[in-house]
């Protein structure tokens, strides 16, 4: 991607990005799959260090449009063009100083290396899937079929996720919840 001129180095911190997005302008900052959409502050500046970002405009100029098949919550074929991805995703980080590769590039390459043909994931990763498809296409990797499922939530509507310190299903069972109670709680 670097040799194709599709990446650049970015020295912005998260604070720099928040400050740039807080500057007076029309409309509010767009929140993408990785948080606030990066405004492109370092694009074209020729920095030689910092995070490596994908220049989404150049990437999409090369690809035109990308699409993936979805069999889950948003059934159908989903197509994304340059304008949509630039506005809603921006120039995503592919590598940082502290981490050699991002989740996005890792999952695209790893799925291909393992011969994955179907991916099932939570609907909270739907927007990130477009990034993965862009990377798959740019790298000449196969694009699997995707199935995004509803998130499993507790009786208060909070999603059950380790990163949110959610209670494990085993804890509900230990407190006397039956399998039927748990199915009802998560909407099955």
For each feature predicted by the language model, list its residue ranges.
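Contiguous mid-protein beta-loop-alpha structural module that forms a pocket-lining wall or clamp
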Residues: 3-16, 22
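Residue-level detector of family-conserved "landmark" positions at structurally sensitive sites
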Residues: 11-12, 146, 182
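Active-site cores that bind ATP or allylic diphosphates and position pyrophosphate for catalysis
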Residues: 15-161, 168-173
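Extended, charge-rich low-complexity interaction segments
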Residues: 174-188
């Amino acid at each position: 991607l670097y040799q194709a001129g599709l990446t650049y180095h970015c020295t912005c911190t998260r604070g720099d990005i928040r400050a740039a997005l807080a500057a007076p302008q029309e409309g509010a900052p767009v929140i993408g799959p990785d948080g606030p959409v990066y405004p492109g502050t370092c694009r074209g500046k020729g920095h030689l260090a910092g995070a490596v970002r994908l220049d989404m405009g150049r990437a999409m100029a090369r690809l035109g449009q990308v699409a993936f098949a979805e069999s889950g919550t948003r059934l159908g074929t989903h197509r994304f063009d340059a304008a949509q991805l630039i506005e809603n995703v921006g120039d995503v980080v592919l590598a940082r100083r502290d981490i050699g590769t991002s989740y996005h590039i890792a999952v695209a390459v790893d799925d291909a290396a393992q011969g994955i043909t179907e991916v099932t994931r939570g609907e909270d990763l739907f927007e990130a899937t477009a990034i993965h498809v862009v990377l798959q296409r740019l790298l000449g990797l196969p694009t699997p079929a995707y199935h995004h499922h509803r998130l499993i939530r507790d009786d208060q509507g909070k999603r059950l996720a380790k990163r949110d310190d959610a209670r494990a299903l085993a804890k509900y069972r230990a407190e006397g919840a039956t399998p039927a109670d748990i199915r009802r709680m998560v909407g099955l």
